[in-house]
Amino acid sequence: AGVSKADLLIAATSTQQVNILTCVIGKKLGVKKCIARISNSELLHRRDSFDYRSIGIDEVIYPETLGASEIKTLLKESAVSDSYAFDKGKLRLIGIKIDERSELKDKTLAETTYLNPDTSFTPVAIVRDIEDKIENETIIPRSHNILKQGDIAYFIAQSDNGVDTVLSLSGRENLQIKNIMIYGGSDLAYTSAKHLSKKYNVKLICEDLPKCEKFADELPNVMVLNGLGTDVDFLREEDLDSMDAFLALSNETEKNILASLAAKESGVKKTISQVENIEFVPLAHNMGLNTTINIKYLTANFIVNYIREGELLNFTSIEGLDADVIEVEVKEGSNVLDNKLKEIGFPKDGIIGGVLR
C-alpha cells in the first residue's frame, strides 16, 4: 500500500483499539503524521498528562466532543442555523432562514445596502430549495440576487454589532434556553447530555434499557428516561411542550427527523437533529428543521485544518451548503497585495466576506 511513503495516516474506524494500533504500526513503517479516532473521552482528557507521540500518534480525535461543542454553540446562538467563529470570534459566519418576518425578504442585495450603513455584515451564500429537485441550489450572491422566503442565507458578520443587525433584520432573537430534552442512546447524545447538564436542565430519552441504566449511573445531573423518541404521547407526558430545545441525537437519521418534527409541532422553538446521511440534509431543511449536525463534517473540518495548518488559518465545510469557507493570511509577497480583485483573477464563484486588519 506504500504506507512508508505517506505523509499522513488517518485511522478513523469505529474501533478505537484498531485505530491506535494502526497508528503505532504506521509510524514504525515511516508515516510522517498519524491521526487516530478514539471512542473514549477519558483518553482525550489525558492529552496533557500522556505523550501520545511516544507511541506514534500525533493527534487524537473524539468526534463526539466536536459535536457536543458545536451543539453548545448552536444553543447559545439559538436564532441561527449555523454559527462559526473566525479570529477568536471577531467575525462570525451565521446561517438564517429567510421567512415572512425578515426585512431582507424579496430584496436584491443592492436594495439591502441602506439596511447595512456601517457594512457590518456581508451576504456570502444562499441555499435555495428548487422545486422537483432533491438537492438544494447554492448561490454565491451578487448585487442583483434576490433573497426569497424559504432561503437559508449565510452572512459573515462582525461579532460586536453585525450579528445583532442581521438578527434584527431577520425578525429573530436568541432564546433564553433552560430546559432541554435529548433523544438518543448514541455517544453524541451521552457526551452532549454530560456537557449541557452543567448549565441546563436536561432530560435524556433512550430506547435501550441497559443504556438508560448506565447513563443514569454516570450522569447524576441528567433525568434519564426509557422510551421511544418517536412516541409523541410519551414525549408530551414528559413535558415536551415545556422544553426550550429538543436535540435528536440517535444514530438513526429518519427517527431523528421524525422526533424533531414532533417536537416542532409541540411548540419547541429550537431543534437540532443529527443527520448521518448527507442526502437527508436538504430534506430536513425543506421540512423546517434548519439546524442539523453531522459529526463526519465536523471531523473532516478538524482534519483539514490539521493538515493545512500554516497554509490556512481556518477551513469550514457546512452540511447542505455546496461551498467551503476558508480563512487565509495575506503574507508579504502575495500576488493579491495592493491589487484590485478584478486584477488578480479572483474566482467568479467565490466571494470575500470580510477582512481582519
Residue ranges and their predicted role:
Residues 1-357:
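Cytosolic regulatory regions of ion transport systems
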